[in-house]
Amino acid sequence: MQANTASLPADGAPVENPAARLISIPFLLLRISTAGGAFAMGLVQTLVFARVLMPDRFSLFILVGAIGYSLWLCDLGLAKILFVQLRAAHLAGKTDARAASQATAVIVFYVLLAAGGSLVCFGLMAVRPSFSLLDATDFGLFFFYITLNLTWVCLRSLSIAVDEYVFYEKLELVRRVGNMATILAMLIGLPFTAFLVGSNVLWAMLVTSAVAKLLSRGAMAPQLRGFARELMAFFQTNMQSIARSGTFALSDIFIYTFPYYVVPWAFGLGAPIIILEATFRIFRGASVIYTAACDLAIPGQTRALAARDAAMLVRTTLIAAALCCLPAAFACGLLIFASKQLFAFLLGSAATVPPTVTPILVVMLLANLVQMVAQSLLLHAGFFREISRIGLGVAVAMVAATAIAVVAGLTIVEFLGVYAAVYSAGALYLAVAAYRGPILAAASPHGAVKWKRAAEPAAAR
Protein backbone atom coordinates (compact mmCIF):
# COMPACT_ATOMS: atom_id res chain seq x y z
CA MET A 1 0.00 0.00 0.00
CA GLN A 2 1.23 3.45 -0.81
CA ALA A 3 0.06 5.98 1.71
CA ASN A 4 0.66 9.67 1.48
CA THR A 5 1.08 10.27 5.17
CA ALA A 6 4.65 11.41 4.71
CA SER A 7 3.74 13.99 2.10
CA LEU A 8 1.95 15.68 4.98
CA PRO A 9 4.16 16.72 7.89
CA ALA A 10 4.80 13.59 9.95
CA ASP A 11 5.41 15.60 13.08
CA GLY A 12 2.60 18.08 12.55
CA ALA A 13 0.96 19.30 15.70
CA PRO A 14 -2.76 18.95 16.15
CA VAL A 15 -4.78 21.93 15.08
CA GLU A 16 -5.43 24.18 18.03
CA ASN A 17 -8.99 25.06 17.10
CA PRO A 18 -11.09 21.91 17.53
CA ALA A 19 -13.80 23.21 15.22
CA ALA A 20 -11.28 23.53 12.41
CA ARG A 21 -10.36 19.92 12.81
CA LEU A 22 -13.73 18.50 11.94
CA ILE A 23 -16.21 20.04 9.48
CA SER A 24 -16.68 23.59 8.19
CA ILE A 25 -20.31 24.65 8.78
CA PRO A 26 -20.49 26.95 5.71
CA PHE A 27 -19.05 24.14 3.61
CA LEU A 28 -21.57 21.73 5.15
CA LEU A 29 -24.55 23.90 4.22
CA LEU A 30 -23.32 24.66 0.72
CA ARG A 31 -22.29 21.08 0.01
CA ILE A 32 -25.66 19.72 1.14
CA SER A 33 -27.51 22.18 -1.09
CA THR A 34 -25.35 21.52 -4.15
CA ALA A 35 -25.42 17.75 -3.68
CA GLY A 36 -29.18 17.82 -3.29
CA GLY A 37 -29.33 19.97 -6.40
CA ALA A 38 -27.19 17.48 -8.30
CA PHE A 39 -29.47 14.61 -7.35
CA ALA A 40 -32.59 16.60 -8.19
CA MET A 41 -31.13 17.78 -11.49
CA GLY A 42 -30.39 14.22 -12.55
CA LEU A 43 -33.96 13.17 -11.86
CA VAL A 44 -35.36 16.29 -13.52
CA GLN A 45 -33.23 15.70 -16.61
CA THR A 46 -34.53 12.14 -16.93
CA LEU A 47 -38.11 13.30 -16.34
CA VAL A 48 -37.93 16.07 -18.94
CA PHE A 49 -36.02 14.07 -21.57
CA ALA A 50 -38.60 11.28 -21.25
CA ARG A 51 -41.29 13.81 -22.14
CA VAL A 52 -39.66 15.98 -24.82
CA LEU A 53 -37.85 13.20 -26.71
CA MET A 54 -39.21 10.11 -28.41
CA PRO A 55 -38.16 6.87 -26.64
CA ASP A 56 -35.72 5.86 -29.41
CA ARG A 57 -34.10 9.33 -29.40
CA PHE A 58 -34.06 9.37 -25.60
CA SER A 59 -32.23 6.03 -25.53
CA LEU A 60 -29.64 7.38 -28.00
CA PHE A 61 -28.95 10.40 -25.80
CA ILE A 62 -28.54 8.03 -22.86
CA LEU A 63 -25.96 6.07 -24.86
CA VAL A 64 -24.12 9.23 -26.00
CA GLY A 65 -24.04 10.43 -22.39
CA ALA A 66 -22.57 7.09 -21.28
CA ILE A 67 -19.87 7.37 -23.95
CA GLY A 68 -19.16 10.91 -22.75
CA TYR A 69 -18.71 9.70 -19.20
CA SER A 70 -16.40 7.01 -20.58
CA LEU A 71 -13.91 9.76 -21.49
CA TRP A 72 -13.25 9.83 -17.77
CA LEU A 73 -11.12 6.80 -18.58
CA CYS A 74 -8.55 9.42 -19.60
CA ASP A 75 -8.57 10.87 -16.08
CA LEU A 76 -6.06 8.31 -14.80
CA GLY A 77 -6.46 9.72 -11.29
CA LEU A 78 -4.56 12.90 -12.21
CA ALA A 79 -6.82 15.12 -10.11
CA LYS A 80 -6.16 13.04 -6.99
CA ILE A 81 -2.40 13.18 -7.49
CA LEU A 82 -2.55 16.96 -7.91
CA PHE A 83 -4.67 17.17 -4.76
CA VAL A 84 -2.06 15.26 -2.74
CA GLN A 85 0.77 17.52 -3.93
CA LEU A 86 -1.07 20.84 -3.57
CA ARG A 87 -2.58 19.86 -0.22
CA ALA A 88 0.82 18.96 1.22
CA ALA A 89 2.22 22.35 0.20
CA HIS A 90 -0.85 24.19 1.51
CA LEU A 91 -0.70 22.51 4.93
CA ALA A 92 2.99 23.41 5.10
CA GLY A 93 2.13 27.06 4.36
CA LYS A 94 3.91 26.99 1.01
CA THR A 95 3.08 27.29 -2.69
CA ASP A 96 4.17 24.53 -5.06
CA ALA A 97 4.81 26.40 -8.32
CA ARG A 98 5.60 23.23 -10.24
CA ALA A 99 2.39 21.53 -9.13
CA ALA A 100 0.44 24.69 -10.03
CA SER A 101 1.87 24.70 -13.57
CA GLN A 102 1.05 21.04 -13.97
CA ALA A 103 -2.48 21.62 -12.64
CA THR A 104 -3.00 24.19 -15.40
CA ALA A 105 -1.72 21.72 -17.98
CA VAL A 106 -4.11 19.01 -16.76
CA ILE A 107 -7.11 21.38 -16.86
CA VAL A 108 -6.26 22.46 -20.42
CA PHE A 109 -5.87 18.80 -21.39
CA TYR A 110 -9.33 17.97 -20.04
CA VAL A 111 -10.98 20.89 -21.87
CA LEU A 112 -9.33 19.93 -25.16
CA LEU A 113 -10.36 16.32 -24.60
CA ALA A 114 -14.00 17.37 -24.17
CA ALA A 115 -13.89 19.61 -27.25
CA GLY A 116 -12.25 16.95 -29.40
CA GLY A 117 -14.71 14.29 -28.28
CA SER A 118 -17.70 16.50 -29.06
CA LEU A 119 -16.36 17.18 -32.58
CA VAL A 120 -15.94 13.45 -33.17
CA CYS A 121 -19.48 12.85 -31.91
CA PHE A 122 -20.81 15.56 -34.24
CA GLY A 123 -18.95 14.08 -37.20
CA LEU A 124 -20.16 10.54 -36.57
CA MET A 125 -23.78 11.68 -36.33
CA ALA A 126 -23.53 14.06 -39.29
CA VAL A 127 -22.55 11.28 -41.72
CA ARG A 128 -25.58 9.20 -40.77
CA PRO A 129 -28.43 9.81 -43.23
CA SER A 130 -31.06 9.48 -40.50
CA PHE A 131 -29.79 12.60 -38.70
CA SER A 132 -29.82 16.22 -39.86
CA LEU A 133 -26.99 18.65 -39.15
CA LEU A 134 -29.08 20.10 -36.32
CA ASP A 135 -29.48 16.63 -34.83
CA ALA A 136 -25.72 16.06 -35.09
CA THR A 137 -25.11 19.45 -33.45
CA ASP A 138 -27.41 18.51 -30.58
CA PHE A 139 -25.53 15.27 -30.00
CA GLY A 140 -22.16 17.06 -30.15
CA LEU A 141 -23.26 19.78 -27.73
CA PHE A 142 -24.72 17.19 -25.36
CA PHE A 143 -21.44 15.26 -25.46
CA PHE A 144 -19.53 18.45 -24.59
CA TYR A 145 -22.03 19.23 -21.81
CA ILE A 146 -21.38 15.79 -20.30
CA THR A 147 -17.60 15.61 -20.69
CA LEU A 148 -16.89 19.03 -19.17
CA ASN A 149 -17.82 17.41 -15.86
CA LEU A 150 -14.33 15.89 -15.93
CA THR A 151 -12.76 19.36 -15.93
CA TRP A 152 -15.15 20.51 -13.22
CA VAL A 153 -14.36 17.61 -10.89
CA CYS A 154 -10.64 18.30 -11.28
CA LEU A 155 -11.24 21.96 -10.38
CA ARG A 156 -13.08 20.76 -7.28
CA SER A 157 -10.07 18.71 -6.16
CA LEU A 158 -7.77 21.70 -6.65
CA SER A 159 -10.16 23.97 -4.74
CA ILE A 160 -10.41 21.60 -1.77
CA ALA A 161 -6.62 21.25 -1.72
CA VAL A 162 -6.21 24.98 -0.99
CA ASP A 163 -9.31 25.31 1.24
CA GLU A 164 -11.38 27.14 -1.38
CA TYR A 165 -14.18 24.62 -1.15
CA VAL A 166 -16.79 27.22 -0.11
CA PHE A 167 -16.12 29.32 -3.22
CA TYR A 168 -16.30 26.24 -5.41
CA GLU A 169 -19.59 25.14 -3.86
CA LYS A 170 -21.08 28.58 -4.53
CA LEU A 171 -20.24 28.13 -8.20
CA GLU A 172 -21.64 24.60 -8.08
CA LEU A 173 -24.90 25.93 -6.67
CA VAL A 174 -25.15 28.44 -9.52
CA ARG A 175 -24.49 25.66 -12.01
CA ARG A 176 -27.16 23.38 -10.59
CA VAL A 177 -29.81 26.10 -10.40
CA GLY A 178 -29.01 27.37 -13.90
CA ASN A 179 -29.04 23.93 -15.49
CA MET A 180 -32.23 22.89 -13.74
CA ALA A 181 -33.98 26.07 -14.85
CA THR A 182 -33.07 25.52 -18.51
CA ILE A 183 -34.04 21.84 -18.36
CA LEU A 184 -37.46 22.64 -16.89
CA ALA A 185 -37.91 25.41 -19.45
CA MET A 186 -38.09 22.73 -22.15
CA LEU A 187 -41.44 21.68 -20.68
CA ILE A 188 -42.85 25.09 -21.60
CA GLY A 189 -41.35 25.23 -25.08
CA LEU A 190 -37.62 26.01 -24.87
CA PRO A 191 -35.98 24.29 -27.88
CA PHE A 192 -33.66 21.41 -27.05
CA THR A 193 -30.78 23.10 -28.91
CA ALA A 194 -31.26 26.30 -26.89
CA PHE A 195 -31.01 24.28 -23.68
CA LEU A 196 -27.70 22.77 -24.83
CA VAL A 197 -26.22 26.10 -25.97
CA GLY A 198 -27.25 27.84 -22.75
CA SER A 199 -25.86 25.06 -20.57
CA ASN A 200 -22.48 25.12 -22.32
CA VAL A 201 -22.27 28.91 -22.06
CA LEU A 202 -22.92 28.56 -18.33
CA TRP A 203 -20.14 25.96 -18.20
CA ALA A 204 -17.71 28.45 -19.78
CA MET A 205 -18.55 31.16 -17.24
CA LEU A 206 -18.21 28.85 -14.24
CA VAL A 207 -14.96 27.23 -15.35
CA THR A 208 -13.48 30.69 -15.98
CA SER A 209 -14.49 31.85 -12.48
CA ALA A 210 -13.04 28.75 -10.81
CA VAL A 211 -9.77 29.05 -12.71
CA ALA A 212 -9.46 32.74 -11.80
CA LYS A 213 -9.83 31.94 -8.09
CA LEU A 214 -7.29 29.10 -8.24
CA LEU A 215 -4.84 31.36 -10.06
CA SER A 216 -5.14 33.92 -7.27
CA ARG A 217 -4.41 31.19 -4.67
CA GLY A 218 -1.38 29.82 -6.50
CA ALA A 219 -3.04 26.46 -7.20
CA MET A 220 -2.78 27.08 -10.95
CA ALA A 221 -0.22 28.98 -13.02
CA PRO A 222 -1.22 31.91 -15.29
CA GLN A 223 0.36 30.53 -18.45
CA LEU A 224 -0.75 28.33 -21.34
CA ARG A 225 2.46 28.34 -23.36
CA GLY A 226 4.29 25.11 -22.84
CA PHE A 227 1.34 23.31 -21.27
CA ALA A 228 2.12 20.18 -23.31
CA ARG A 229 5.64 20.15 -21.86
CA GLU A 230 4.30 20.55 -18.33
CA LEU A 231 1.78 17.77 -18.94
CA MET A 232 4.51 15.41 -20.13
CA ALA A 233 6.68 16.35 -17.14
CA PHE A 234 3.77 15.60 -14.81
CA PHE A 235 3.31 12.16 -16.36
CA GLN A 236 7.04 11.41 -16.19
CA THR A 237 7.44 12.58 -12.58
CA ASN A 238 4.38 10.74 -11.31
CA MET A 239 4.44 7.69 -13.56
CA GLN A 240 4.20 5.16 -10.73
CA SER A 241 1.38 7.01 -8.98
CA ILE A 242 -0.47 7.45 -12.28
CA ALA A 243 -0.13 3.75 -12.99
CA ARG A 244 -1.67 2.93 -9.62
CA SER A 245 -4.30 5.65 -9.32
CA GLY A 246 -4.97 5.33 -13.05
CA THR A 247 -5.75 1.66 -12.67
CA PHE A 248 -8.31 2.58 -10.03
CA ALA A 249 -9.74 5.45 -12.10
CA LEU A 250 -10.08 3.24 -15.17
CA SER A 251 -11.73 0.42 -13.26
CA ASP A 252 -14.00 2.80 -11.34
CA ILE A 253 -15.44 4.54 -14.39
CA PHE A 254 -15.61 1.21 -16.20
CA ILE A 255 -17.72 -0.28 -13.40
CA TYR A 256 -20.19 2.60 -13.63
CA THR A 257 -20.43 2.85 -17.43
CA PHE A 258 -20.00 -0.61 -18.88
CA PRO A 259 -23.66 -1.62 -18.25
CA TYR A 260 -24.62 1.10 -20.75
CA TYR A 261 -22.71 -0.83 -23.42
CA VAL A 262 -23.88 -4.28 -22.33
CA VAL A 263 -27.61 -3.50 -22.13
CA PRO A 264 -28.09 -2.15 -25.70
CA TRP A 265 -26.09 -5.08 -27.07
CA ALA A 266 -27.71 -7.82 -24.97
CA PHE A 267 -31.21 -6.40 -24.47
CA GLY A 268 -31.60 -3.72 -27.16
CA LEU A 269 -32.30 0.02 -27.20
CA GLY A 270 -35.60 1.51 -26.08
CA ALA A 271 -37.15 0.25 -22.83
CA PRO A 272 -34.17 -1.80 -21.52
CA ILE A 273 -31.68 1.07 -21.58
CA ILE A 274 -34.30 3.51 -20.26
CA ILE A 275 -34.90 1.14 -17.31
CA LEU A 276 -31.14 1.01 -16.76
CA GLU A 277 -30.93 4.80 -16.90
CA ALA A 278 -33.73 5.25 -14.35
CA THR A 279 -32.08 2.77 -11.99
CA PHE A 280 -28.59 4.18 -12.38
CA ARG A 281 -29.83 7.76 -12.22
CA ILE A 282 -30.90 7.10 -8.62
CA PHE A 283 -27.77 5.02 -7.96
CA ARG A 284 -25.40 7.68 -9.30
CA GLY A 285 -27.42 10.46 -7.68
CA ALA A 286 -26.89 8.80 -4.33
CA SER A 287 -23.16 8.64 -5.12
CA VAL A 288 -23.13 12.42 -5.59
CA ILE A 289 -24.74 12.94 -2.19
CA TYR A 290 -22.41 10.45 -0.51
CA THR A 291 -19.44 12.17 -2.17
CA ALA A 292 -20.64 15.48 -0.76
CA ALA A 293 -20.72 14.06 2.76
CA CYS A 294 -17.27 12.54 2.29
CA ASP A 295 -15.88 15.82 0.94
CA LEU A 296 -16.86 17.47 4.21
CA ALA A 297 -14.41 15.20 6.00
CA ILE A 298 -11.43 15.68 3.68
CA PRO A 299 -9.86 18.73 5.42
CA GLY A 300 -10.19 17.09 8.83
CA GLN A 301 -8.97 13.72 7.57
CA THR A 302 -5.85 15.15 5.95
CA ARG A 303 -5.04 17.18 9.07
CA ALA A 304 -5.52 14.07 11.19
CA LEU A 305 -3.15 12.12 8.96
CA ALA A 306 -0.61 14.94 9.17
CA ALA A 307 -0.82 14.93 12.98
CA ARG A 308 -1.10 11.11 13.17
CA ASP A 309 -4.29 11.61 15.17
CA ALA A 310 -6.19 8.35 14.64
CA ALA A 311 -9.03 9.37 16.96
CA MET A 312 -9.79 12.50 14.96
CA LEU A 313 -9.48 10.57 11.69
CA VAL A 314 -12.05 8.03 12.87
CA ARG A 315 -14.39 10.76 14.19
CA THR A 316 -14.42 12.75 10.96
CA THR A 317 -14.89 9.60 8.90
CA LEU A 318 -17.78 8.44 11.09
CA ILE A 319 -19.40 11.87 10.82
CA ALA A 320 -19.23 11.59 7.03
CA ALA A 321 -20.71 8.08 7.20
CA ALA A 322 -23.52 9.26 9.48
CA LEU A 323 -24.35 12.09 7.09
CA CYS A 324 -24.47 9.56 4.25
CA CYS A 325 -26.93 7.43 6.23
CA LEU A 326 -29.55 10.19 6.30
CA PRO A 327 -30.19 10.40 2.53
CA ALA A 328 -29.67 6.64 2.23
CA ALA A 329 -32.46 5.97 4.72
CA PHE A 330 -34.77 8.40 2.93
CA ALA A 331 -34.05 6.96 -0.52
CA CYS A 332 -34.42 3.35 0.62
CA GLY A 333 -37.70 4.14 2.37
CA LEU A 334 -39.04 5.90 -0.70
CA LEU A 335 -38.10 2.98 -2.92
CA ILE A 336 -39.56 0.37 -0.57
CA PHE A 337 -42.91 2.11 -0.17
CA ALA A 338 -43.37 4.12 -3.38
CA SER A 339 -41.05 2.84 -6.11
CA LYS A 340 -43.91 2.22 -8.55
CA GLN A 341 -45.16 5.78 -8.27
CA LEU A 342 -41.62 7.19 -8.38
CA PHE A 343 -40.63 5.42 -11.60
CA ALA A 344 -44.00 6.16 -13.22
CA PHE A 345 -43.57 9.86 -12.44
CA LEU A 346 -39.98 9.81 -13.64
CA LEU A 347 -40.43 7.99 -16.96
CA GLY A 348 -44.07 8.58 -17.85
CA SER A 349 -44.96 6.32 -20.76
CA ALA A 350 -41.36 5.91 -21.98
CA ALA A 351 -40.85 2.62 -20.08
CA THR A 352 -42.09 0.63 -17.07
CA VAL A 353 -39.58 -0.42 -14.40
CA PRO A 354 -40.32 -3.93 -13.02
CA PRO A 355 -41.01 -3.98 -9.24
CA THR A 356 -38.25 -6.57 -8.75
CA VAL A 357 -35.70 -3.83 -9.48
CA THR A 358 -36.52 -2.13 -6.15
CA PRO A 359 -34.74 -4.52 -3.72
CA ILE A 360 -31.74 -4.66 -6.05
CA LEU A 361 -31.51 -0.87 -6.09
CA VAL A 362 -31.79 -0.72 -2.28
CA VAL A 363 -28.81 -3.09 -1.96
CA MET A 364 -26.86 -0.99 -4.47
CA LEU A 365 -27.54 2.22 -2.51
CA LEU A 366 -26.32 0.70 0.76
CA ALA A 367 -23.23 -0.84 -0.84
CA ASN A 368 -22.51 2.49 -2.50
CA LEU A 369 -22.56 4.20 0.90
CA VAL A 370 -19.90 1.86 2.26
CA GLN A 371 -17.86 2.15 -0.92
CA MET A 372 -17.87 5.96 -1.10
CA VAL A 373 -16.86 6.50 2.55
CA ALA A 374 -14.00 4.01 2.37
CA GLN A 375 -12.87 5.05 -1.10
CA SER A 376 -12.77 8.76 -0.24
CA LEU A 377 -10.55 8.11 2.77
CA LEU A 378 -8.20 5.87 0.78
CA LEU A 379 -7.97 8.27 -2.16
CA HIS A 380 -7.29 11.44 -0.22
CA ALA A 381 -4.79 9.67 2.01
CA GLY A 382 -2.87 8.61 -1.11
CA PHE A 383 -3.45 4.85 -0.85
CA PHE A 384 -3.55 4.40 -4.61
CA ARG A 385 -1.99 0.95 -4.85
CA GLU A 386 -4.62 -0.84 -2.77
CA ILE A 387 -7.64 0.86 -4.34
CA SER A 388 -6.23 0.14 -7.81
CA ARG A 389 -5.96 -3.55 -6.95
CA ILE A 390 -9.49 -3.65 -5.58
CA GLY A 391 -10.90 -1.68 -8.50
CA LEU A 392 -9.20 -3.92 -11.03
CA GLY A 393 -10.45 -7.02 -9.23
CA VAL A 394 -14.04 -5.74 -9.19
CA ALA A 395 -13.86 -4.80 -12.88
CA VAL A 396 -12.60 -8.26 -13.84
CA ALA A 397 -15.28 -9.91 -11.68
CA MET A 398 -17.92 -7.68 -13.26
CA VAL A 399 -16.89 -8.68 -16.79
CA ALA A 400 -16.87 -12.36 -15.88
CA ALA A 401 -20.28 -12.13 -14.18
CA THR A 402 -21.71 -10.24 -17.14
CA ALA A 403 -20.44 -12.83 -19.59
CA ILE A 404 -22.09 -15.57 -17.53
CA ALA A 405 -25.32 -13.56 -17.34
CA VAL A 406 -25.44 -13.05 -21.12
CA VAL A 407 -24.62 -16.68 -21.91
CA ALA A 408 -27.23 -17.85 -19.41
CA GLY A 409 -29.84 -15.63 -21.05
CA LEU A 410 -30.68 -13.68 -17.90
CA THR A 411 -33.21 -10.85 -18.03
CA ILE A 412 -32.17 -7.24 -17.47
CA VAL A 413 -33.46 -7.44 -13.87
CA GLU A 414 -31.36 -10.54 -13.21
CA PHE A 415 -28.38 -8.80 -14.81
CA LEU A 416 -28.84 -5.88 -12.39
CA GLY A 417 -28.91 -8.39 -9.51
CA VAL A 418 -25.58 -9.87 -10.61
CA TYR A 419 -24.13 -6.35 -10.91
CA ALA A 420 -25.31 -5.48 -7.37
CA ALA A 421 -23.74 -8.64 -5.89
CA VAL A 422 -20.30 -8.00 -7.39
CA TYR A 423 -20.43 -4.29 -6.55
CA SER A 424 -21.32 -5.05 -2.90
CA ALA A 425 -18.37 -7.42 -2.53
CA GLY A 426 -16.01 -4.71 -3.78
CA ALA A 427 -17.47 -2.18 -1.33
CA LEU A 428 -16.83 -4.46 1.64
CA TYR A 429 -13.26 -5.04 0.52
CA LEU A 430 -12.68 -1.27 0.33
CA ALA A 431 -13.97 -0.85 3.89
CA VAL A 432 -11.44 -3.41 5.15
CA ALA A 433 -8.66 -1.65 3.20
CA ALA A 434 -9.61 1.74 4.71
CA TYR A 435 -9.14 0.36 8.22
CA ARG A 436 -5.92 -1.50 7.44
CA GLY A 437 -4.45 1.48 5.60
CA PRO A 438 -4.95 5.14 6.62
CA ILE A 439 -6.52 4.45 10.03
CA LEU A 440 -3.65 2.21 11.15
CA ALA A 441 -1.16 4.59 9.53
CA ALA A 442 -2.55 7.48 11.59
CA ALA A 443 -2.55 5.43 14.78
CA SER A 444 1.20 4.83 14.65
CA PRO A 445 4.16 5.48 12.35
CA HIS A 446 4.45 1.71 12.27
CA GLY A 447 0.72 0.99 12.29
CA ALA A 448 0.55 0.32 8.56
CA VAL A 449 3.59 -1.93 8.52
CA LYS A 450 2.13 -4.05 5.73
CA TRP A 451 2.21 -1.11 3.39
CA LYS A 452 5.94 -1.09 2.68
CA ARG A 453 6.31 2.38 1.21
CA ALA A 454 4.05 4.36 3.51
CA ALA A 455 6.76 6.97 4.15
CA GLU A 456 7.57 7.78 0.54
CA PRO A 457 6.68 11.35 -0.54
CA ALA A 458 4.09 11.77 -3.27
CA ALA A 459 6.52 13.57 -5.55
CA ALA A 460 8.90 10.62 -5.46
CA ARG A 461 6.16 8.24 -6.50
What are these regions (language model features)?
Residues 140, 169-220, 393-397, 411-436:
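Hydrophobic alpha-helical transmembrane segments
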Residues 26-38, 64, 72-125, 308-332, ...:
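Membrane-water interface segments that mark the loop-to-transmembrane alpha-helix transition
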Residues 58-62, 66, 139, 270-281, ...:
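Small-residue hotspots at the loop-to-helix junctions and early N-terminal turns
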Residues 20, 125-142, 270, 311, ...:
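Interfacial segments at transmembrane-helix termini and the short loops linking adjacent helices
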Residues 148-174, 363-393:
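Membrane-interface junctions at transmembrane-helix termini in multi-pass inner-membrane proteins
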Residues 76-92, 161, 220-221, 283-308, ...:
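Helix-loop junctions and terminal segments of transmembrane helices
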Residues 26-46, 172-179, 199-220, 229-299, ...:
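Transmembrane helical elements of multi-pass membrane transporters/channels
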Residues 2-24, 193-200, 210-256, 300, ...:
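Interhelical loop/hinge segments that connect adjacent transmembrane helices in multipass membrane
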